[in-house]
Amino acid sequence: MSSILDIGSEFVAEAKNGDFTALIQLFDARVKGWGKTMAHEEEMTVGLFSDLVYEIPSYCAFDMVDSAVDICMQQTSFDGFNCALDLIASLVIKSNTTEVPEKLRAAFPEILVKSKRFGGEPVDICTLIRGHYRNTL
């Protein structure tokens, strides 16, 4: 049985080093190939970007939040938006800092509005992001 992490795996090495184009390619491949934030595999549950988050250095995760915000702002479907929010949250947590990237700060009000319009998991992910930043967003 193959893993969802096999989808787009050729882009992980470049994405973990801060390549925005590779991050977009990874995102597009995973959303098209699976489209959900998690998968229950044979012996474990994995997140859509677990491999990237495991390998990316914290300083690079911080830098890639801006790219993930750009991806998020372009999403029109529930699944795309939800997966983009999950990517943002994963990078935010991996960044190991409570310093809010400026692009995220600027876009967060619009992201919240869109999350509330979709409802459900996107709202929960926004709450997680806010909690990481100690509710300063």
List where the protein language model places each region.
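Extended alpha-helical scaffolding segments
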Residues: 53-137
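Generic structural signal of hydrophobic/aromatic residues within well-ordered alpha-helices
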Residues: 11, 23, 27, 45-49, ...
